[in-house]
Curated annotation (Swiss-Prot):
The lineage of its organism: Eukaryota, Metazoa, Chordata, Craniata, Vertebrata. Residues 27-129 are annotated as: 13 X 8 AA approximate tandem repeats. Cross-linked envelope protein of keratinocytes. It is a keratinocyte protein that first appears in the cell cytosol, but ultimately becomes cross-linked to membrane proteins by transglutaminase. All that results in the formation of an insoluble envelope beneath the plasma membrane. May participate widely in the construction of cell envelopes in cornifying epithelia characterized by either increased thickness or a requirement for extreme flexibility. Belongs to the cornifin (SPRR) family. This is Cornifin-A. Keywords: Cytoplasm, Keratinization, Repeat. Sequence repeats lie at residues 27-34, 35-42, 43-49, 50-57, 58-65, 66-73, 74-81, 82-89, 90-97, 98-105, 106-113, 114-121, 122-129. One of its GO terms (cellular component) is cytoplasm. Disulfide bonds: none annotated. GO terms for biological process: keratinization. It is found in: Cytoplasm. It holds the Pfam family Cornifin. Its main location: cytoplasm. Residues 1-41 are annotated as: Disordered.
Length: 144
């Protein structure tokens, strides 16, 4: 009987201790954490906002605008315009004009005309006899 009584009181205290330990631990960390993070955060962005945009805005546009257009505009158009059209115009038309029309004109019509009619005429009349009758009449009339 005495052993049973000792076990009962032993099981009860550990349950009470666990509950008491969990309850006091949860509330204390939330209370001190919430006010500490908010307090130091609010004053930090206030002094940053006015200091950042004030010195940045006037410094960036002032030196950038006058420096970029002044040296870029006169340097780019002056040396580019005279150098590009002068050497390009005389070099391109001179060697291209005589080479393209001379060798292309005689070569294209000569081999094309005799090759096209020769193999085409005998192939068409063989399978189609009806087309043979009108084709020779047209050729004879043209020759006369």
């Amino acid at each position: 009987m005495s052993s049973h009584q000792q076990k009962q009181p032993c099981t009860v205290p550990p349950q009470l201790h666990q509950q008491q330990v969990k309850q006091p631990c949860q509330p204390p960390p939330q209370e001190p954490c919430a006010p500490k993070t908010k307090d130091p955060c609010h004053p930090v962005p206030e002094p940053c906002n006015p200091k950042g945009p004030e010195p940045c805005h006037p410094k960036a546009p002032e030196p950038c605008h006058p420096k970029a257009p002044e040296p870029c505009n006169p340097k780019v158009p002056e040396p580019c315009q005279p150098k590009v059209p002068e050497p390009c115009q005389p070099k391109v038309p001179e060697p291209c004009n005589p080479k393209v029309p001379e060798p292309c004109q005689p070569k294209a019509p000569e081999p094309c005309h005799p090759k096209a009619p020769e193999p085409c005429h005998p192939v068409v009349p063989e399978p189609c006899p009806s087309t043979v009758t009108p084709s020779p009449y047209q050729q004879k009339t043209k020759q006369k």
